[in-house]
């Protein structure tokens, strides 16, 4: 998959509009559109990092050097969010996970 198509695919999978991704990355809507539709794109390392972060993937995945799946990327994004939560909230999430695990094993 080409770079621009990868961005567009990830963006739509996450339910983000061009405007929303642009806002999350400090870019313009037209810049994101150009990245998705022009070849070859030339984003800076800083922009690549911002876009990858907003889409919940690694830069390597974004540029096609890694085959991390969207599911893996979602897991990575979840754990990134999880690690930033207060300890009590993380404890509650772990307890919920144990309860759900018990229910699914029955």
Features from the language model and the residues they span:
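Short alpha-helical DNA-recognition segment
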Residues: 16-35, 39, 50
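Interfacial/linker helices and their anchor residues that mediate assembly or domain coupling
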Residues: 67-106
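DNA major-groove recognition helix of helix-turn-helix/homeodomain DNA-binding modules
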Residues: 26, 44-61
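Aromatic/hydrophobic pocket-lining residues that form π-stacking "cages" and hydrophobic walls in ligand
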Residues: 7, 48, 93
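N-terminal positioning helix adjacent to the helix-turn-helix/winged-helix DNA-binding module
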Residues: 3, 43-47, 74
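A short, Lys/Arg-rich alpha-helix, primarily the initiator
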Residues: 1-13
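Conserved amphipathic alpha-helical interaction elements at protein-protein interfaces in regulatory
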Residues: 13, 57, 99-102
């Amino acid at each position: 998959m080409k770079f621009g198509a990868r961005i567009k695919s990830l963006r739509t999978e996450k339910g983000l509009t061009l405007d929303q991704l642009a806002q999350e990355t400090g870019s313009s809507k037209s810049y994101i559109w150009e990245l998705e539709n022009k070849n070859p794109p030339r984003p800076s390392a800083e922009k690549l990092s911002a876009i990858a972060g907003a889409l919940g993937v690694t830069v390597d995945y974004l540029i096609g050097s890694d085959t991390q799946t969207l599911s893996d990327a979602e897991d990575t994004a979840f754990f990134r969010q999880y690690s930033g939560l207060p300890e009590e909230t993380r404890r509650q999430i772990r307890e919920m996970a144990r309860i759900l695990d018990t229910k699914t094993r029955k």
